Amino acid sequence: MRHRKSGRQLNRNSSHRQAMFRNMAGSLVRHEIIKTTLPKAKELRRVVEPLITLAKTDSVANRRLAFARTRDNEIVAKLFNELGPRFASRAGGYTRILKCGFRAGDNAPMAYIELVDRSESKAEATAE
């Protein structure tokens, strides 16, 4: 029985899930908006929000924790230099999930997940 087990399995083993969310978190931090399936977006929110909360307090220990979770120095730099200060006054809720219809091949529900205070120049580039 799966009583009180949190998180979705997403038909993957644990190492595949961990690698997938590590890559997706890096993409979300880098591009500030990504398109994925709705269940993956909802699970990704549980990975990215604690990373941004960690980035609000800049210290060597926090940078090492963030690197351990993302394995990418470029992502760690953006988290602590841009996103941490940007969300300093916001107490959680750094991401927004927007449903965007269904995928053509398998009718899977799709969604955009984006950072809330995303800069408008990136929004215009994504729209084009």
Swiss-Prot record:
Q: What is the lineage of its organism?
A: Bacteria, Pseudomonadati, Pseudomonadota, Gammaproteobacteria, Enterobacterales
UniProt keyword annotations, A-Z: Ribonucleoprotein, Ribosomal protein
Q: Name one GO molecular function term.
A: structural constituent of ribosome
Q: Gene3D superfamilies in the record, alphabetically?
A: Ribosomal protein L17
Q: Which GO terms describe its cellular component?
A: cytosolic large ribosomal subunit
Q: What is this protein called?
A: Large ribosomal subunit protein bL17
Q: What family name appears in the similarity comment?
A: Belongs to the bacterial ribosomal protein bL17 family.
Disulfide cross-links: none
Q: Name one GO biological process term.
A: translation
Q: How does it assemble?
A: Part of the 50S ribosomal subunit. Contacts protein L32.
